[in-house]
Amino acid sequence: MYILQESLFSFEELQKLESKERLPIFFSALDLRPYAKELRSRSPRGADGHCRQGILRALLAAPLENISTFTGLHRRLDMDLRFRYQCGLRLDREAPSVATLSRVFADLTSKDLAKRLFEDLVTRCKQEGIIDGCHVAIDSAAIHAYEKKQPKRKSELTGNANWGAKFDSFGNKIKWFGYKLHLAVDTKSELPMALEVTPAHVHDGDLAPNLMEQVAVRTKVEFFVLDAGYDQLKNYETARNLKAQAIIPMNLRNEKEPPAGMMSNGTPCCSMGFPMTYWGAVGDILKFRCPHATGKVDCPLGMAACSSSNYGMVVKVDTTSDLRRYSTPHRDSKRWKELYHERTSVERCNARLKTFLTADAMHVWGIRKVTTHQYLNAIVLLASALAMAGHSSKAAA
């Protein structure tokens, strides 16, 4: 079963516009003055530099225009006067040099300004109703490094790029040298709410608790949706502590035998060995009924062998007795499957970042600069959503 979800904004629609039309709409959602102020030099000496707000605009426009290098951005600013003007840079002087662009990017990194801007935009999207935040999907994506490949043992000591491996949707094992981008995405809008960058060898499940906690600071989450790679008790416990439910398929590799009279997915079996019928939940208690009474099986003993009631035997399970095995709603129920299919939202968000933007076309090295690069790409998605929402409301007025 596949559920087609509609995004609240069309990033692809913004992409279809010509650059001269797209950039004014995109910049209309951004007030970069507070961030640009922190990028200005405090020294009274030296010549006046380029407008820091203009350079910050250019660095944000670069992923939108599929520009992945400082050299490419300098060339575009130098050759395209309309682009330079729309970024807010003066036309009566030369375009910012590659060194200037690189220096401002380094300042963004050292002061964590990209992260601050990202978090502020997430808050704005939440306030304007673009991000819902009740259902959040978490996953990681492979990011190839712009760094010299090193042996695994040596690269693990640097804390930067490393060798990683994972299986794709078709079961093929993929290896790469670089990083992992870990994303927490609102399933309704398909917009990022939190991100982390790690060396490629770091296991996905180790980052999930931190992402959950970051998201929970801004919104009340009901469900965290993750794939089987996150099937670890600590992820269920973290979701539980945040008053949410983790929706994660069980990874049955190396799985121990379930308790007697219980299936691996947490469904109890009747005395004849038939799986009982899930009949809803009240709080942390799951209710299961006799499968013969609900018409799921034709038991040779009927209901009388287990219960004198026409309702049939009832078994109640406390989900807190095993947070990993039991879930509310029950594993493999219709509602559980509907929630799990929302996980495709994070895959689509990853695809936008890597296909339409420059998340996987890096020309910076070191984990801190790589993280800034990923934040700039995520900011483009958030700003695009705000811009398109504002543009649509003006058009409707």
Language model segments and positions:
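Basic, amphipathic alpha-helical segments enriched in Lys/Arg and hydrophobic/aromatic residues
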Residues: 328, 334-397
